[in-house]
């Protein structure tokens, strides 16, 4: 499962599928971990890298594993089935138990991660981080719905991501503007990283709303976009 899809701005509730039996529920949580709530009882492996909500760099991998997942890792290892080291979870598990990593991670990544985790715990942990992202996303989506030329890309409000918002912009012929022109104007004035995922092929803005992003900054961004669109529309 994918807890949050970064390119499209879609999130899902994590629920163990009915009738899954002894199958493991494995979740890609790279853009969700630290910003969205989840119930450990519903999953077996929740894995991520820290470059999103944890405000660090990629290049290191973390996984929260249930006892069932650990048992499966041990069982596969005991079977002597060949597995390349890069995919051998037993190596990762053994190193984790020893408070080590198989490969040497970049020190800067760990320093930034430690700083961010400390701040996240100071403000109240995961529940507070979730609330912060929820506030930011509410600001963004409410703003878009109040504009004739902007629409949340994800139609189902329950599935709109709290941490990555995608906003469709109407075409010029429909009273809108080119989203690339909006991004260019923002970038020229020091507001960066509002570009959409190009392969999606939409006239769209994409906004990060991870816990480290102040909701007031999201509010300020919407005001900036209003000014830019007004200027572009002439």
Residue ranges of model-derived segments:
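Conserved active-site segment immediately N-terminal to the catalytic lysine
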Residues: 26, 40-51
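Active-site phosphate-binding strand-loop segment of PLP-dependent enzymes
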Residues: 1-30, 45
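Small/polar glycine-rich anion-binding or flexible loop at a beta-alpha turn
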Residues: 157-164, 198-206
């Amino acid at each position: 499962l994918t807890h949050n899809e970064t390119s499209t701005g879609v999130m899902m509730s994590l629920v163990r599928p009915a009738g899954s039996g002894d199958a493991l529920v494995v979740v890609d949580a790279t853009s969700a971990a630290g910003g969205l709530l989840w119930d450990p009882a519903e999953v077996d492996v929740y894995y991520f890298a820290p470059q999103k909500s944890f405000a660090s760099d990629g290049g290191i991998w973390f996984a929260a594993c249930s006892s069932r997942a650990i048992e499966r890792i041990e069982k596969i290892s005991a079977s002597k089935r060949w597995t390349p080291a890069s995919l051998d979870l037993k190596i990762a598990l053994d190193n984790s138990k020893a408070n080590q990593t198989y490969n040497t991670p970049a020190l800067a990544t760990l320093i930034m991660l430690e700083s961010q985790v400390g701040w996240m715990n100071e403000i109240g942990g995961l529940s507070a981080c979730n609330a912060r992202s929820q506030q930011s996303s509410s600001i963004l989506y409410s703003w878009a719905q109040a504009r004739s030329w902007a629409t949340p890309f994800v139609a189902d409000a329950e599935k709109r991501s709290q941490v990555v918002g995608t906003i469709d912009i109407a075409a010029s012929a429909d009273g809108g503007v080119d989203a690339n022109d909006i991004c260019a104007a923002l970038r020229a004035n020091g507001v960066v990283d509002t570009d959409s995922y190009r392969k999606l092929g939409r006239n769209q803005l994409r906004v990060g709303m991870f816990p480290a992003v102040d909701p007031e900054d999201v509010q300020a961004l919407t005001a900036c976009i209003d000014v830019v669109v007004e200027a572009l529309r002439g």
